[in-house]
Design a protein with these regions (language model features):
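Short amphipathic alpha-helical surface micro-motifs
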Residues: 37, 65-67, 93-94
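Structural microenvironment flanking redox-active thiols in thiol-disulfide oxidoreductases
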Residues: 60, 90-95
Length: 202
């Protein structure tokens, strides 16, 4: 069943989500502070003309949520857009409507609605271009660190030390590119919102 206005109203506010966090709070707050800088005057005009409501699904243990949920939160804050957040593991009926590739409960999810509560579309996990960048970096790291034991094996079959080095590199690469990738997230949300008309209900 789609997220009704009534169900939407039962979601967490951004502050309520933050207050419930038990993991990754410091990184999340840092991302919130930095994300404000990615918005433009063009974004302000766009969302004035295409106001939307945003339902987000996430969990604090997920790295993609820690990176991209702050984008949705700051977008809503900057442009006065209604936003509610639902914990994935407590709302499986919701996440199961937005499965990645029809089978994965990937998060975050952003679902956008117009003023008449028509669903305009949704964003899942991360921009495809970011996934491509991450895969390219993984290949580069494996090639330049071929001396690491098992570096070309499936991740779950790698020795612990190799997995640790890969995680360290992936984390560095992600946060080095955070603002650019967050900007791509904004652009994808704008593409979804483009079919909305003025006059969204607050």
């Amino acid at each position: 069943m789609p997220i009704s206005r009534e169900r939407f109203a039962q979601g967490l506010t951004a502050q309520e989500f933050i207050d419930k966090m038990t993991k990754n709070q410091e990184r999340f707050q840092e991302n919130l502070e930095k994300t404000t800088a990615i918005f433009t005057d063009e974004d302000r005009v766009f969302f004035a003309e295409h106001p939307v409501s945003i339902a987000a699904i996430g969990e604090d243990w997920c790295t993609d949520v820690i990176q991209f949920l702050p984008v949705g939160i700051k977008l809503a804050e900057a442009f006065d857009l209604p936003l509610r957040i639902f914990l994935r593991d407590e709302n499986l009926d919701l996440i199961d409507q937005y499965l990645k590739e029809g089978k994965y409960r990937s998060i975050p999810v952003f679902v956008l609605y117009d003023s008449d509560w028509n669903e305009l579309g949704y964003f899942t996990e991360r921009p495809d271009s970011v996934t491509q960048d991450m895969a390219k970096e993984s290949r580069r790291f494996a090639l330049e660190n071929s001396d690491l034991e098992g570096v070309n094996r499936a991740y779950e079959n790698m020795p612990d030390e190799t997995r640790a080095k890969i995680r360290e590199n992936s984390s560095r690469f992600r946060w080095d590119n955070m603002l650019e990738w967050n900007r791509r997230c904004v652009d994808e949300l704008k593409q979804i919102a483009a079919s909305a008309t003025a006059g969204a209900t607050r």
